[in-house]
């Protein structure tokens, strides 16, 4: 039931994102979607490590929005329409009602045994999918980690070289 | 019911991100944010796929690192364009 509610809310978030115009509102939707997807991936595996990393990375990407909005798009309004909210709540409740009508066992946890719990936690494919990262630093695949380090360093240098301009302010010019 | 959503949800979210990307937005940052949205949903799909493998989940880390690097490069291109041309309107790209 928890996962189904998360699925329905991700669908609603994607539909709301489709109607957004302002970058700040799109960033807010992206942040909500990141929280939902990290909760979903945490529920699929046995530990929340990956979802923690995902949330921190995308939250760091959101920090650029504030300087953007304060310097470039400071005079734009954004509004959430009432019709869109009504349609979203309607779709959300429709998905929940259809699920309850089709599958009555998904609303009650206490009648399930252990195998059914594992089905509803959606890690039924492998018994041992604890998503461990022990190949990250061992020999045949640590070369990919070294490649990642070099790529990050080259990206750092490239970003500094691209944004090294000594003319023009960071503000809109109409 | 849940298994019906299991693989089709990230594909649907990916398609929604692609629709947001190709719909004509005003700012360049909206395009970059929709690209981040596509990357997020592709990471979700990759995570579901790597649940089937046993020890390959470090590929998700690699995917996240590459996506972060490309996002940083896109933002640096946007900053450079703002400082040279004054705005980041997507409609004025054919003038550049």
Swiss-Prot record, chain A:
A GO CC term attached to the entry: mitochondrial membrane
Transmembrane segments: 24-44, 48-68, 82-102, 143-163
Annotated InterPro entries: ComplexI_Subunit6 (IPR050269), NADH_UbQ/plastoQ_OxRdtase_su6 (IPR001457)
Similarity annotation: Belongs to the complex I subunit 6 family.
Catalytic reactions of this protein: a ubiquinone + NADH + 5 H(+)(in) = a ubiquinol + NAD(+) + 4 H(+)(out)
Subcellular location: Mitochondrion membrane
GO function terms (MF aspect): NADH dehydrogenase (ubiquinone) activity
Protein name (Swiss-Prot/TrEMBL): NADH-ubiquinone oxidoreductase chain 6
Keyword Transmembrane helix among UniProt keywords: yes
Pfam families: Oxidored_q3
Transmembrane helix found in the keyword field: yes
Organism: Ceratitis capitata (Mediterranean fruit fly)
Membrane topology: Multi-pass membrane protein
Role noted for this protein: Core subunit of the mitochondrial membrane respiratory chain NADH dehydrogenase (Complex I) that is believed to belong to the minimal assembly required for catalysis. Complex I functions in the transfer of electrons from NADH to the respiratory chain. The immediate electron acceptor for the enzyme is believed to be ubiquinone.
Entry EC number(s): 7.1.1.2
Keywords, alphabetical: Electron transport, Membrane, Mitochondrion, NAD, Respiratory chain, Translocase, Transmembrane, Transmembrane helix, Transport, Ubiquinone
Gene behind this protein: ND6
UniProtKB/Swiss-Prot annotation, chain B:
GO-annotated biological processes: ATP synthesis coupled electron transport
Enzyme class: translocase
Lineage: superkingdom: Eukaryota
Places the protein is found: Mitochondrion membrane
Pfam families per UniProt: Oxidored_q2
GO cellular component, one term: NADH dehydrogenase complex
Main localization, broad class: mitochondrion
Residue runs in coiled coils: none
Signal peptide interval: none
InterPro entries in the record: NADH_UbQ_OxRdtase_chain4L/K (IPR001133), NUOK/Mnh_C1-like (IPR039428)
UniProt keyword terms in alphabetical order: Electron transport, Membrane, Mitochondrion, NAD, Respiratory chain, Translocase, Transmembrane, Transmembrane helix, Transport, Ubiquinone
UniProt key word ATP-binding: no
EC number: 7.1.1.2
GO molecular function: NADH dehydrogenase (ubiquinone) activity
Chain ranges passing through the membrane: 2-22, 28-48, 58-78
Catalytic activity line of the entry: a ubiquinone + NADH + 5 H(+)(in) = a ubiquinol + NAD(+) + 4 H(+)(out)
Membrane topology: Multi-pass membrane protein
PANTHER family membership: NADH-UBIQUINONE OXIDOREDUCTASE CHAIN 4L, NADH-UBIQUINONE OXIDOREDUCTASE SUBUNIT ND4L
Family of this protein: Belongs to the complex I subunit 4L family.
Function: Core subunit of the mitochondrial membrane respiratory chain NADH dehydrogenase (Complex I) that is believed to belong to the minimal assembly required for catalysis. Complex I functions in the transfer of electrons from NADH to the respiratory chain. The immediate electron acceptor for the enzyme is believed to be ubiquinone.
Protein name (record): NADH-ubiquinone oxidoreductase chain 4L
Organism: Ceratitis capitata (Mediterranean fruit fly)
């Amino acid at each position: 039931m928890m996962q189904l509610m998360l699925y329905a809310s991700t669908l609603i978030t994607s539909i709301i994102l489709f109607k957004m115009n302002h970058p700040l509102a799109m960033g807010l939707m992206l942040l909500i979607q990141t929280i939902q997807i990290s909760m979903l991936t945490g529920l699929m595996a046995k530990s929340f490590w990956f979802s923690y990393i995902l949330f921190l990375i995308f939250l760091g990407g959101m920090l650029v929005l504030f300087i953007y909005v304060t310097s470039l798009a400071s005079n734009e309004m954004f509004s959430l329409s009432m019709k869109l909210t009504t349609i979203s709540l309607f779709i959300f409740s429709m998905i929940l009602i259809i699920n309850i009508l089709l599958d009555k066992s998904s609303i009650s946890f206490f009648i399930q045994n252990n195998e059914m719990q594992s089905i509803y936690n959606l890690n039924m494919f492998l018994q041992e999918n604890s998503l461990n990262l022990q190949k990250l630093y061992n020999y045949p695949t640590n070369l990919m980690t070294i490649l990642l380090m070099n790529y990050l360093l080259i990206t750092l240098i490239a970003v500094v070289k691209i944004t090294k301009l000594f003319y023009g302010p960071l503000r809109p010019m109409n | 019911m849940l298994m019906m959503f299991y693989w089709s949800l990230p594909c649907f979210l990916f398609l929604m991100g692609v629709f947001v990307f190709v719909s004509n937005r005003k700012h360049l940052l909206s395009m970059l944010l929709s690209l981040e949205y596509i990357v997020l949903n592709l990471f979700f799909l990759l995570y579901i796929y790597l649940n089937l493998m046993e020890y390959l989940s470090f590929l998700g880390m690699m995917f996240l690192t590459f996506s972060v690097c490309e996002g940083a490069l896109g933002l640096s291109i946007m900053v450079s364009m703002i400082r040279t041309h004054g705005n980041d309107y997507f409609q004025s790209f054919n003038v550049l």
